[in-house]
């Protein structure tokens, strides 16, 4: 099992433990010293690094994305629903770019010149991964923000293992575009699931585990192939 697989596995376990402690004892991440998600995830990553430099990079990336994702979540939560609708208009092109190896022709849907140019580009696997993550997270955020807009201003301290997964992935890429997609993905997932947590705790816990596992498996499969 590679370092990425081990780190993703321990990160999911740590996040589930954090969620259990919060639900069992009624604590929040900001008030429980043992429930600081960014710190625990960073420490967990250290045990699965082969060198001191990898451990340092894991800590820096985890904490950086923890704070960046939390800050951007506040911004996304305050955006009007009209903006989320405009984001949904870019979903088809994101889907085609991320799922296509070349130009894709969909029956009954003509592709414009700009879209053809984008689809004809040979994208690295890491870029395709981030586009998929971005597309999925935008979908979640649009859904929950439209259903429960009044619950968006909630505790934004819960950041999921997608932060660490993304931070480890970004170490293999120097693209600024990839970095921006990581931050947006983390913020969207955080905003969506945190909003849901104040509505239904058990459903939030289930989605947290499902989304974490899904994104982690997708990341590991792409990085190891």
UniProtKB/Swiss-Prot annotation:
The keyword Isomerase does not apply. It is a multi-pass membrane protein. Keywords: Membrane, Transmembrane, Transmembrane helix. It comes from Saccharomyces cerevisiae (strain ATCC 204508 / S288c). It is found in: Membrane. Partially overlaps PEX14. The keyword Transmembrane applies. GO terms for cellular component: membrane. It comes from the Eukaryota. The chain crosses the membrane at residues 40-60, 63-83, 151-171, 176-196. This is Putative uncharacterized protein YGL152C.
